[in-house]
């Protein structure tokens, strides 16, 4: 897919260039799910994380095969590595529920908190897509069509394809997906 403002890496670059507050006090770029989990576990800014599936959703700035940030791509994007959270496996335990969070949630303090994975990655597993060569149509808030592969497929990665390449939740799983932003949500309007 072509780089556009939808990719978190592009937003991060814009934000870093245009937010005086982040320039002065910002520590890491993270998604909402790791932010919430980190607060439940009482993690510091330096302990922030992102799972490899959500990380691959950045679209730019990472190496999908090594599951590491790509210094070369981040340099091209003018994003300093210091702003990138550590990359973890979706099943890694990132901490334990704090006493304060236990009081607020009603859950027992000290229970382990797992990093988790993105909704699209998990929907692939939930649909039974565990190996290459399968597809699923998802009618969630967005309407998506996902196809599992063994890795990057040049024909699907060409400019203008409208497809995004991602790591799956499980090791060695990959998929392409395209979406329409109002797909499934439009069913509410139709009703």
Which role fits each region the language model picked out?
Residues 2-118:
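Gly/Ser/Thr-rich active-site cleft segment
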Residues 103, 107, 111-191:
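Catalytic phosphate/nucleotide-handling subdomain of diverse soluble enzymes
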